[in-house]
Curated annotation (Swiss-Prot):
Enzyme Commission identifier(s): 3.1.4.2
Gene (UniProt): gde1
InterPro entries named among the record's database cross-references: Ankyrin_rpt, Ankyrin_rpt-contain_sf, GDPD, GP_PDE_dom, PLC-like_Pdiesterase_TIM-brl, SPX_dom
UniProt-recorded name of the protein: Glycerophosphocholine phosphodiesterase gde1
Pfam families registered for this protein in UniProt: Ank_5 (PF13857), C2_GDE1 (PF25329), GDPD (PF03009)
Length: 1135
């Protein structure tokens, strides 16, 4: 993902308008770079008075820098004052506090400390993102405009400002840490005092207050400090004791700060009727009428008590009643304030109403879903003030963020708020309601005038497009029913239906189908978010080249947020960076993908004649990633008890700001994202260990750690078998207490070095082992070009839309067997089927390969063989048993199976095997088994097809003509497939499975063309690492549920294929028939596009795909489809 997109995700709503306009300035740089040299130089020079030209890039940078500095200075002062208030606030009297159950005060203070900690993290995030944005913009100017802004602007100006270093934020954090320690000490003291047995004064005083015996309360007030008097007054308000109130107010006097503090405390502890507060106001008015001659001073006192006096959080009495939802008190207080002569009309959106957390009484009522309290506040507000700019987050947008509060939405709109008002990111309330899956809010907004065609800033998406991209079926139905247009396109030219289909939400296609003819010209890929980052692609290409000399280790991290350091300790272990070689000479930055130590590694590594690498002392085996923890990124873990000091020295780990893994397009509620994938190489995987550290923010202090052996993350079951189930999460232990503080899911894929070189069917292509230096500067372009040219005839579609370049591939040979076919079919995945498909003009034939219990690759589609009369997985049957399940095994195959069986040593003299001549024909049980189980049609079935014996991969390679290419599908179940088909969750070890099949192909394959494919993403990765033949990733494109995110949708499949530089994808044809323009998106990524599925047997569907550029179709009726395409070409030529 690009930095500008990550920055949009990291925006903190409160500060949204104060961020650097990164995208705007970057576009300006591109425009200036396209100008003639004279005009460009003019815009980059200062005027005679020292100012920058109006509208120039430098002027924009200066203005944005000033915005950032102003906000930082304002906020840091506010937060420092907040800390000071909390530290100087007097503690209440212990006994009276206990009498009022004022453990609430301690809890409230603890909440304030947490909120302050959170605000400091937000400010830290704001500073880091803007600093990074300035650095990238300066580097961009230097790159495209030939300036030196990285030095003159960034280093000499930005880096010297307070916001760009951590000193002031650290000072606040250290003060907060000290305050938190004192709070903990006071809590311990309170607990000890609560152990005392007798509190006669407390019990008597409470009884006297409840009975409103003022004389006894007067005695307790003699010589009492203000804090005690405030507590007694608060207790009197709660009890509704008028006489006690008079006496205590007489002692306190008409001091607004004490009276407001007592009233706030009483309101916060109210648990029943609010008559006591009304009695307090009545008593106060009576006293004021005696003390003051006119009503001016009494009104002013009430105004100060209710509105002006604030606590340490900057909240007044009005904030308290709105937060707790006391609607009656809200009405009463608003009535009192409005009745004061010469008072200004109430406007809850004015900055003066904001507390330290930028909350107003209005926003507090919204967050608490207090409809009646909100109604009271809005009734007292001047109707004209609703047009006033409400701040960074409009109330309607805020409502849709915090909950599905349709009644709150109704109150706000009826009070005059604009339903189409936008926030700083140009999102309306309707966009926000869709993003957070608030169907009731969506209904109410549409009912009260929200515009369903409003567009956001980032992608120019309407609410319908956003709902489609997140798969929210209910909201899509609501929007379509309200008249939202399904024909509109976003900034890249894609419709809502295409956004839904590419993300795997095919069930929405019927609701979003457009009747408008869309252009078949290439469109922008931006809003589809299917591109892999260049750094990901580079790191994986380098891993492919290093595979010959080292094992590649892919570590995946999930379910852990914050600043994470992942290290691999082992023999010559190195993190494979995706850093561009062009940056090798440039200065390192805080987000470079490789530190300088990696450069020295490249320089010091030498390549021996056998392709091995000499280890260097500067090798880097760790990487730091910033995993987003909320709507703002890189906030890191700032734990008060583990606060890092500002002068800690950073280590030499590579720092990787992991924008590439963060999904920018909105995720559905409870949706999943791909894990964070890191690539390492090492020589010895058996002795390697993985260390995962949770680091403090802005330092390398370790807050938690987990360590494990690399091999322990592979669920090895012995005998080359492994489990499909994920391992249990690893506990992350605190560095101080050694107690678990979090859990992390870690998954590992290891591509082990094999004795033989990587398999290639092309003699002209060789790949010697490369050093890391060579890998960093030499790409696999030549190798890829050779691969693509080798298969060009099968994967190139002509510009005219003709099908003469479209490969027709026989599905499982001549085609998948169908029960409804009227003509007799050859059995699928049989030798006869493969040979016949070649005779009928198939460019390639597709076959499915699995392995038996005795490790022989065989050709069979289903994971379960039930021709035996029982369900048996292929890997649980020996070759003899597998071939015996065939309806008509050939004599040659019988002999092969017998030879294998006879070579096997019996486990005991009493054991024996069934001779070949008397082996059991399992086919006799098939008919009985079919009656007992649900009707699942099996290919190559007796009575439905020209039944042929099962076959091995070796026989296919020997018998099928060399002129016919083979599309070999490696059948390996994913966990979701195993659960669907009720398989045991075990399978062969990844490496053993792939190596065994590749060795057979290498030994017997000859010089034919090969394409490898698999539905399992990890198998595809190993094929790309272990073989130079083209690899295709098979995806169901959303037509079936898959737990692996990479296999769940067309979008994820395209990103995955791009990352690992596969030849292309083989997609289920349904999504591409629904949205054929997505074929062009696949081609724009440089990937080949193959399709499979029953719908490919319809000629019209195939022609539709051919028109948009599909490279190959896998079909069941090879002859009919080939003839139809030839006729299609002839009709085009005649036209």
């Amino acid at each position: 993902m690009k930095f500008g997109e990550s920055l949009q995700l990291a925006l903190i709503p409160e500060f949204a308008e104060q961020y650097v306009d990164y995208n705007g300035i970057k576009r300006k740089i591109q425009l200036v770079a396209a100008l003639p040299e004279d005009e460009r130089k003019k815009l980059l020079r200062r005027n005679s008075d020292g100012s920058w030209p109006k509208g120039s890039i430098d002027e924009m940078l200066e203005n944005d820098l000033q915005k950032v500095v102003n906000l930082f200075n304002t906020r840091i002062v506010q937060l420092d004052n907040y800390v000071t208030r909390l530290s100087t606030e007097k503690s209440p009297n212990t006994e009276i506090t206990q009498a009022l159950s004022s453990s609430y005060e301690a809890e409230e203070k603890a909440k304030q400390l947490k909120e302050l900690d959170f605000r400091l993290q937000q400010l830290s995030s704001f500073c880091e993102w803007n600093k990074l944005a300035f650095e990238k913009l300066a580097a961009n100017m230097d790159k495209h405009l030939g300036t030196e802004r990285l030095v003159t602007f960034y280093e000499q100006k930005v880096c010297k400002l307070d916001f760009a270093n951590s000193s002031k934020i650290y000072e606040s954090m250290i003060a907060l840490k000290a305050l938190n320690s004192s709070q903990n000490d006071s809590e311990v003291k309170d607990k000890l005092e609560k152990l005392s047995i007798h509190h006669p004064l407390k019990k008597d005083l409470l009884a006297f207050i409840q009975l409103d015996i003022a004389a006894e309360v007067v005695t307790a007030c003699i010589n009492a400090p203000d804090s005690v008097l405030v507590d007694i007054l608060a207790a009197s308000i709660i009890a509704g004791a008028k006489a006690c109130m008079r006496e205590v107010i007489g002692r306190i006097g008409l001091r607004s700060e004490c009276l407001a503090s007592a009233l706030r405390r009483a309101i916060n502890n109210l648990c029943g009727p609010d008559e006591g507060v009304l009695y307090f106001l009545e008593v106060l008015k009576q006293i004021c009428s005696v003390v003051y001659v006119d009503s001016y001073h009494s009104n002013r006192l009430l105004s100060r008590i209710l509105l002006v006096e604030r606590n340490s959080k900057g909240q007044s009495v009005m904030h308290s009643v709105a937060k707790l939802g006391w609607a009656g008190l809200c009405s009463k207080f608003c009535e009192i304030v409005s009745s004061i002569p010469d008072s200004e009309p109430l406007n809850w959106m004015l900055p003066c109403w904001r507390d330290v957390m930028h909350d107003t009484p209005l926003t507090l009522a919204i967050k608490g879903n207090h409809v009646e309290a909100l109604h009271a506040l809005l009734s007292a507000q001047d109707k004209e003030t609703t047009s006033t700019k409400p701040g960074p987050v409009p109330p309607l947008v805020l409502t849709c963020c915090v909950g599905d509060y349709d009644l709150i939405v109704e109150e706000l709109i009826l009070a005059g708020f604009n339903p189409n008002e936008v926030d700083a990111s140009s999102n309306t309330a309707l966009h926000t309601a869709v993003r957070y899956n608030r169907p009731e809010c969506v209904k109410m907004l549409l009912k009260l005038g929200a515009n369903p065609s409003a567009r956001d800033f980032l992608n120019s998406w309407t609410p319908l497009m956003l709902a489609s991209a997140t798969g929210l079926s209910e909201i899509v139905s609501i929007l379509v029913a309200s008249g939202a247009s399904v024909d509109e396109v976003d900034s890249s030219g894609w419709t809502a239906m295409e956004q839904a289909v590419v993300r795997g939400y095919l069930h929405l296609a019927d609701k979003l189908r457009t009747q408008v003819a869309l252009s078949d010209k290439p469109v922008n890929l931006h809003t589809l978010y299917i591109k892999a980052s260049s750094s990901e692609m580079r790191s994986r290409k380098r891993a492919m080249d290093l595979q010959l000399s080292r094992s590649v280790v892919i570590i995946r991290i999930s379910d852990l947020a914050g600043r994470i350091r992942v290290s691999l300790q082992g023999d010559d272990a190195v993190y494979v960076s995706g850093r561009s070689p062009s940056f090798a000479a440039s200065r390192p930055s805080s987000v470079d993908f490789m530190s300088q130590s990696t450069d020295s590694l490249s320089k010091n590594d030498t390549t021996a004649s056998n392709g091995s690498m000499t280890p260097s002392s500067s090798q880097n085996n760790s990487v730091i990633i910033d995993i987003p923890r909320s709507h703002f990124d890189n906030a890191g873990e700032v734990c008060l008890e583990n606060l890092a000091e500002p002068d800690e020295i950073a280590d030499d780990s590579i720092h990787l700001h992991y924008d590439a893994a963060q999904e920018n397009s909105p995720q559905p509620v409870n949706g999943s994202s791909p894990p964070y994938e890191l690539v390492f190489v090492t020589r010895n995987t058996e002795e390697a260990t993985i260390t995962i550290d949770l680091l403090a923010n802005r330092s390398h202090k370790i807050l938690g750690r987990t360590v494990c052996c690399l091999t322990s993350l592979v669920s090895d079951l012995g005998n080359h078998m492994q489990s499909l189930k994920p391992l249990a999460p690893l506990p992350l232990l605190s560095s101080k207490t050694l107690k678990p503080i979090a859990h992390v899911n870690a998954d590992v894929l290891i591509s082990k070095v094999t004795v033989d070189d990587r398999f290639s069917s092309n003699d002209g292509i060789s790949t010697p082992a490369l050093s890391l230096e060579a890998v960093s500067n030499v790409s696999r372009t030549a190798l890829e070009d050779a691969e693509r040219s080798l298969h060009k005839s099968a994967t190139t579609t002509s510009e005219s839309g003709k099908s003469n370049g479209v490969a027709v591939i026989g599905h499982r040979g001549l085609g998948k067997n169908q029960p409804d076919r009227l003509s007799l079919q050859l059995g699928e995945n049989t030798l006869q089927s493969f040979i016949k498909a070649a005779d009928l003009g198939a460019s390639y034939v597709e076959l499915d390969v699995q392995m038996t219990k005795d490790m022989v690759p065989v050709v069979y589609h289903d994971f379960i063989v039930n021709e035996t009369g029982t369900d048996a997985q292929v890997h649980s049957l020996t070759l003899e048993q597998f071939l015996g399940a065939s309806h008509s095994p050939s004599e040659e195959i019988k002999d092969d199976a017998s030879d294998i069986q006879q070579k096997r040593r019996p486990r005991a003299y009493s054991s024996s095997f069934t001779p070949s001549g008397s082996q059991v024909n399992f086919g006799e049980f098939a008919e009985e088994n079919a009656r007992l189980k649900p009707k699942v049609y099996k290919g190559n079935a007796l009575g439905h097809t020209i039944c042929a014996p099962f076959t091995t991969l070796k026989d296919v390679l020997k018998e099928v003509p060399q002129s016919v290419g083979l599309n070999v599908e490696f059948k390996y179940p994913m966990l979701s497939e195993a659960e669907e088909e009720k398989l045991l969750p075990i399978a062969y070890d990844y490496n053993f499975y792939v190596d065994t099949i590749l060795s057979i192909i290498k030994k017997y394959g000859g010089k034919r063309k090969y394409i490898f494919s698999s539905f399992n993403p990890d198998i595809c990765i190993l094929l790309s690492l272990k073989s130079t033949n083209p690899v295709l990733f098979l995806t169901e494109g959303g037509t079936a549920y898959r737990t692996d995110v990479r296999a769940a949708s067309l979008r994820q499949a395209l990103k995955f294929a791009s990352q690992w530089s596969f030849l292309g994808i083989v997609s289920a044809c349904e999504p591409l028939i629904m949205c054929p323009r997505l074929i062009k998106a696949v081609k724009q990524l440089g990937l080949s596009c193959y399709t499979y599925g029953v719908l490919n047997n319809d000629v019209d569907n195939v022609r539709r795909q051919v028109r948009f550029g599909v490279d190959a179709v896998i079909v069941d009726n090879v002859l009919a489809i080939r003839r139809a395409l030839n006729q299609y070409d002839e009709s085009l030529e005649s036209d």
